[in-house]
Each structure stands twice: as structure tokens, then as C-alpha cells.
Amino acid sequence: MKVYLDMCSIQRPLDSQDDVRVATEAQAVLGVLRLCESGQVTLVGSDALLFELEKNPHPIRKDYAAVVLSNAAAFAVTDQRVETRARQFELTGMKPLDALHLASAVEAEADFFCTCDDRLLKRARAVETGRTRVVSPLELVAEVSR
């Protein structure tokens, strides 16, 4: 099973845990990452994730995300197919980087694309993603725990 976590999902465990939703999503992401580390789930990395990682001005968050992405056993290169699909997603109102993440997941044939971003979740569920299911961290942990 291949899973693509966007950067907000990867970073969720570092967010303030004062909100119940954030704390629950953080635990869900950590559970999925443990499955990736054990080889039960394949984490998909991408050029888009590396680009976003490099832009992060917070050293702790940047280092944490780099460690997470070092465990990616699959990788989506931003090629012509990814760029074309991302442009199609942008036409639906997705932000360019969000569209690039989703396109990377779809072209890498990830089973799941996971985001904590409610706006992206709604927009991504409205487009054709083939075999890639768009899920929240809580939905993802329920799926991978089966």
C-alpha cells in the first residue's frame, strides 16, 4: 500500500496539541509513519515535498520533515505528466503547490493522498484521481489499520 502525505500531514505531529482534532490527527500520522518505518506501508516522496521542505524557515520542522521523507521508499519526480495533471487540478481552484502534490500522488499511483487541509480535501475529492483515494489522517489510519 502506497501513501502520499502532504507537508501539512507530515508536520501535524509538531503542531500545537491543544485542539482535540489536531492531537488526534497527529497520533494518526505518527501511527502511519510507524507502519512506513516497519515496511508495512510505502511512503511516497516527491519533488514537490522536497521543494516545500527547502522553503521551510523553521529548523526543527525542516529537520523533522527531512527525516520523515528519508523513509520514503517511492518517489514522484515532477515530469511532464505530473505538470500537466497539476495544471488540470489548478483549473478547479486548487492552489498550484497543492495541485502539484495531488498530481504527484496520482502519477506515483499512490493508494492514498492524505492532507489535514480541509479546503484541499474538499477540492481534491471533487476531481478524478484514479486509484488514489483522498483522505484525512483519521480516515487514512482507519484504512491502513485494516
Please state what every model-predicted region is.
Residues 36, 68-69, 127:
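A generic structural signal for well-ordered alpha-helical segments
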Residues 47-52, 69-91:
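Acidic catalytic patch
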Residues 2, 11, 17-26, 91-92, ...:
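Acidic, PIN/NYN-like endoribonuclease modules and their adjacent C-terminal/linker elements
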Residues 29-34, 65-66, 102:
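Short amphipathic alpha-helical segments and helix-helix/interface helices
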Residues 77, 96-99, 115:
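Short beta-strand scaffold positions
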Residues 4-57, 74, 138-142:
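PIN/NYN-family metal-dependent endoribonuclease catalytic core
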Residues 55-70:
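Short, electropositive alpha-helical surface patch
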Residues 9, 49, 82, 100-101, ...:
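Alpha-helix capping/helix-boundary segments
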